Amino acid sequence: MIEAKEDSGPLENRVLRARARGELSADAAFEILFREYRRIVASWLAVRVESAAIDDLAQDVWLIFYGRFRRWEFGAEMESTEARPVLSFLFRTCQFVARGHQRLARSRRSDPIEEAEERAVSGDPQSVLRGVEAARALSLARRVCPEEELDVLLAKLAGMSAREVAQALSITEAVVDHRYRDALARLRAKLRVGS
């Protein structure tokens, strides 16, 4: 089946090919993609919006994706092992949904760090520590990076290539690389000085 790695490339490309061949229904393919990317979608939103809104906004992202996925055109993007059209679509949709929410809310009421620390109580010590450190790093990035750098940083951390990020944000790959380097430099400088 899909998850057995009989086909080459990322899971999403194998799912898209199986769906195009009629081996998977739209719902079965959606379920696999949801399991693969739900944490990434939530993490993208966690950096952008208050923690109380994440679940609702993630649901909005997935509803938008589901509607689009049922009409998905299975084209050349499935042939490249580097391209991940689903991840790119989810990234753009997260940006759109989060910005719409920000325009309505105009304020952040809680910090993702607090929520990560609350959830940390139930995990093993190493994963708890990694989760808290990641939440702190993302919170710092949100404070010190301009929005356009934060967009690139989040996409790169999720594993998107510079080409995918460039296409998603309608910028050049050189600009993606520049913004990514600038975001990392800001974070390093802030960490050296102390947050």
Regions inferred by a protein language model and the residue ranges of each:
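Short, well-structured alpha-helical segments
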Residues: A42, I54-W62, L150-L154
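A short, charge-rich alpha-helical start-of-domain segment used by transcription regulators
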Residues: I2-G9, A20-A46, Y66
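Amphipathic alpha-helical segment used for protein-protein interaction
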Residues: V121-S161, Q167, H178
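Arg/Lys-rich amphipathic alpha helix in sigma70-family domain 2
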Residues: V47, R71-F74, F91-I113, P125
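Hydrophobic/aromatic residues within well-ordered alpha-helical segments
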Residues: L33-Y37, V41, V61, L90, ...
